[in-house]
């Protein structure tokens, strides 16, 4: 099974991905769960991620950014995601193809057909379940120290947020929007509980993973 978490920077998706990975690891065993992230997931990608995060005043144009992230996705897909799925594991990814559509497509204005074509070329797998964590722009920006490739203004994040909402509306069979209201610990775990309940409802106890 392939599960992805999506949303704007600072929405809380990384925390929720980690919490779900722990929950499923406790349920099925750590050896049956793979947690990865984009950009990142491999030693090479993590080096590139670190370099990108260090770019405080350097701007990439939309096409350059798209091609860079697409190449990193291919590296992660063939080294982490696909092997995990072929081994029958539950793979959880903090970001996947929907992020490219929302960020480079809706956010940067790159042609959506081009984004879709490149996504399909490098990763011909569609997630089984996608949780889109929706948070206000104000809350998200307050949570994160914006730098490097994340250094964009509120208007950009408005476009990206609307992009994610459009993706959810267009893919109701796999995408599920989860509202995140605050940073409070009780809200974080309440969100986790909602995700677990939704996961159980979606799978309907049909997920059979050998321990």
From Swiss-Prot:
This is Thymidylate kinase. SUPFAM superfamilies: P-loop containing nucleoside triphosphate hydrolases (SSF52540). ATP binds at residues 7-14. Belongs to the thymidylate kinase family. InterPro entries: P-loop_NTPase (IPR027417), Thymidylate_kin-like_dom (IPR039430), Thymidylate_kin_CS (IPR018095), Thymidylate_kinase (IPR018094). Keywords: ATP-binding, Kinase, Nucleotide biosynthesis, Nucleotide-binding, Transferase. One of its GO terms (molecular function) is dTMP kinase activity. Its EC number is 2.7.4.9. The keyword Kinase applies. Pfam families: Thymidylate_kin. One of its GO terms (biological process) is dUDP biosynthetic process. It is an enzyme of class 2 (transferase).
């Amino acid at each position: 099974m392939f599960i992805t978490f999506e949303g704007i920077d600072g929405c809380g998706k990384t925390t929720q991905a980690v919490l779900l990975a722990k929950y499923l690891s406790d349920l099925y065993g750590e050896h049956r769960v793979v947690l990865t992230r984009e950009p990142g997931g491999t030693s090479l990608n993590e080096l590139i991620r670190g370099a990108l995060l260090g770019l405080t005043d350097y701007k990439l144009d939309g096409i350059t950014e798209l091609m860079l992230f697409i190449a990193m996705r291919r590296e992660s897909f063939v080294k982490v995601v696909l092997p995990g799925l072929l081994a029958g594991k539950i793979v959880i990814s903090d970001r996947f193809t929907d992020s490219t559509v929302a960020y480079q497509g809706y956010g940067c204005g790159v042609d959506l057909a081009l984004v879709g074509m490149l996504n399909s070329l490098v990763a011909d797998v569609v997630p089984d379940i996608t949780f889109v964590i929706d948070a206000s722009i104000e809350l998200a920006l307050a949570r994160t120290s914006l730098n490097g490739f994340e250094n964009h203004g509120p208007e950009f994040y408005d476009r990206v947020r609307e992009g994610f909402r459009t993706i959810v509306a267009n893919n109701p069979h796999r995408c599920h929007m989860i509202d995140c209201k605050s940073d409070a610990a009780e809200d974080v775990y309440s969100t986790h509980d909602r995700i677990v309940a939704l996961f159980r409802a979606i799978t309907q106890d049909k997920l059979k993973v050998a321990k």
